[in-house]
Amino acid sequence: QSRKDELKGTIKLVFQPAEEGHAGAYHVLESGLLDDVSVIFGLHVIPNLPVGVVASRPGPFMSAAARFAATFTGKGGHAGVPHDAVDPVVAVSSAVLSLQQLVSRETDPLEAAVVSITILKGGDAYNVIPESASLGGTFRSMTDEGLAYLMKRIREIIEAQAGVNRCAAAVDFLEEELRPYPATVNDDGMYGHAKAVAEAMLGEANVRVAARSMGGEDFAFYARRSPGAFFFIGVGNETTMGPAAAVRPVHSPHFVLDERALPVGAALHAAVAIEYLNKHDCS
């Protein structure tokens, strides 16, 4: 704020609301608040880098990601006479195994993709075949096209396996409640700009090339609207990253961050924005 009158343009600060799963960035864009934004930059804490280190990469950085749920409906019955029932548990099991082939047999091995079944529910009695059973999970790809292909095939496989096993299947991709995220793709120019500013501020050795990540990130919605760059910022230290420590990921209840990273991130955000305005005079 003390340098507000020196800015050669406008800087908007965006706290990412509902970033985890509910596509907050999509709704921020829908509000129109960022319609006049030329470029955008973002930071995300990362525990396996120390304070004072940032990392990113040009081009595709984080995966497109989505969720799915499916319910298989058969005919319940006594487990001792399975021929009088239509077993949805067998149908679910067949679908789980068939879905594994999407990555191993239908995805180019040089392209990253994930299909993980993380929810499996059936009956609640040892001697009863349930009327229905369900599964759910996540699927990811480093491209939006790859995600669309996986979505199409997941539906086809689930419906086909249900049919083979005489069941009906309902597939839900939760697109309103948990909107799929596109891939996070860093613009080459914006990545280069942010990298140069970070190197001048932190030193070249402290600005690293990050590996691609299969994590999903709603910054991707912003980066599709305006050229952008997204960076990881280290929040680890000798205690959280030391020989006796197990680095706790950001979604762990045991995650700990070194708050000395906060002023580093704030300063980097400010410097990246101010230097961009100085070079492009957006006033």
Predicted segments, located by residue:
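Metal-dependent amide/peptide-bond hydrolase catalytic core
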Residues: 90-283
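Histidine/acidic-residue-rich, glycine-tolerant segments that coordinate divalent metal ions
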Residues: 3-130, 217
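Structural signal for the C-terminal ends of transmembrane alpha-helices
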Residues: 1-2, 277
